[in-house]
Regions:
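Transmembrane helix boundary and interhelical junction motifs in multipass membrane proteins
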Residues: 155-160, 248-253, 263-265, 282, ...
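Long extracytoplasmic/lumenal interhelical loops at the membrane interface
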Residues: 240-279
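Hydrophobic alpha-helical transmembrane segments of multi-pass inner membrane proteins, especially
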Residues: 6-14, 22, 32-229, 270-328, ...
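Membrane-helix interface and discontinuous TM-entry motifs in multi-pass inner-membrane proteins
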Residues: 142-157, 239-255
Length: 372
């Protein structure tokens, strides 16, 4: 068992529970007849279940899961498609399924399924991955799931993460810098063109991109959309700015008192900045950096390519999600609606993140057994 990794994860989970209670107690008190711990309890039970599943997965040899790669991909597709007739709406988005009274977010299943499927696929291709056909075959595999997440669930952030996981796993198995440089330049050019079209359309009185177009315009000038799409961003920036170096103190945030909607979700990092200041924000970022470093150490020493790719996939998932969340909160990129791993409120998210950590711990355990 990699106790360094385990300690970091347990620390982030404990800190997350504290911040979930701090950020949600006001809203819970107003919504649930004075029950200020309502969100905290739900997150606590999800965390306990997740830890139990994590240890279960960690003690199973990771190669046990390889035959389930194709079924995992198929299940991911089916669950996303089931949102069309059976989707459960929450906070203005239809991204959940209700199963036996429990909400399940298929996007989280899809991320795990994609990691497992691509790791198995790349290993089975062998040296064929280095050919142009093999390279683009792997790159195309996540596209259907990414498109479904985007169009069916309006979840652009999860679509970006799924594609990001694929690109990172592909880069590790086939480090052809020219191809990746070309892909990166094309992605940047496409994003810049989209922003240019939306801005020009807005200047001429037109409308392009619907609510996503509004989000981009609000990102460029949040004060001009202070009563609409820019409201949450501005309130988050006020929270960050008012925290100073050491913060106002744990539980002393004013922005969580109805100013930042659902502060325990995507914008929880802004409350961390307000209550714990720059010091607390840097401490959280450092913990994620150490976590990613441990992933890199384990991947570099993995017993085989399949184990290394599993760890790289989990690394990509968590790293991209952390970067996107902090970038959104600080208004570095448009609002995409993405949670902060292990810290934001969300039972499905923490459960599947801990399953992924279980896979990483299983690979780490394989390293120790190999060295004996």
């Amino acid at each position: 068992m990699d106790y360094s990794l385990l300690f970091i994860v347990i620390f982030l989970l404990g800190f997350g529970l504290i911040m979930v209670y701090s950020t949600s107690s006001y809203n819970a008190n107003m919504q649930f007849d004075g029950d200020s711990a309502w969100y905290f309890r739900k997150q606590l039970w999800a965390t306990i279940l997740g830890i139990a599943v994590m240890f279960f997965v960690a003690n199973i040899p990771y190669h046990f899961w390889e035959p389930f790669a194709v079924p995992a991909y198929i299940v991911s597709v089916v669950l996303i498609l089931l949102i069309i007739p059976f989707g459960h709406e929450s906070h203005g988005a239809t991204r959940w399924l209700r199963i036996a009274g429990v909400s399940l977010q298929p996007a989280e299943v899809a991320k795990l399924g994609m990691i497992l499927f691509l790791a198995s696929m790349i290993c089975s291709m062998g040296k064929g991955i280095r050919s142009r056909k093999g390279f683009y075959t792997v790159l195309v595999v996540p596209v259907p799931i990414a498109l479904m997440l985007w169009k069916i669930t309006d979840n652009v952030s999860s679509a970006i993460i799924v594609m990001g996981i694929a690109v990172l796993m592909l880069f590790v198995s086939c480090p052809d810098y020219k191809r990746f440089l070309l892909l990166g330049l094309l992605a940047i050019a496409a994003a810049a063109l989209l922003v240019f079209i939306i801005v020009k359309s807005s200047e001429s009185g037109g409308e392009v991109g619907g609510f996503r177009g509004e989000r981009i315009l609000a990102w460029l000038d949040p004060e001009a959309y202070a009563s609409g799409k820019g409201f949450q961003t501005l309130q988050g920036l006020y929270a960050i700015g008012s925290g100073g170096i050491l913060g106002k103190g744990l539980g002393a945030s004013k922005q969580k008192l109805g100013f930042i909607p659902e502060a325990q979700n995507d914008m929880i990092f802004s409350i961390i900045c307000e209550e714990l200041g720059l010091f607390g924000a840097i401490a959280v970022i450092l913990m994620f950096i150490i976590l990613i470093w441990r992933f890199m150490v384990i991947a570099n020493n993995a017993p085989d390519l399949f184990g290394a790719l599993l760890v790289v996939g989990v690394l990509g998932h968590i790293a991209i999600q952390v970067i996107l969340n902090i970038a959104v909160v600080t208004n570095t990129i448009p609002n995409t609606g993405i949670s902060l791993p292990f810290i934001s409120y969300g039972g499905t998210s923490v459960l599947f993140l801990l399953i992924e950590i279980g896979l990483v711990l299983s690979v780490a355990k394989g390293i120790r057994l190999k060295d004996l």
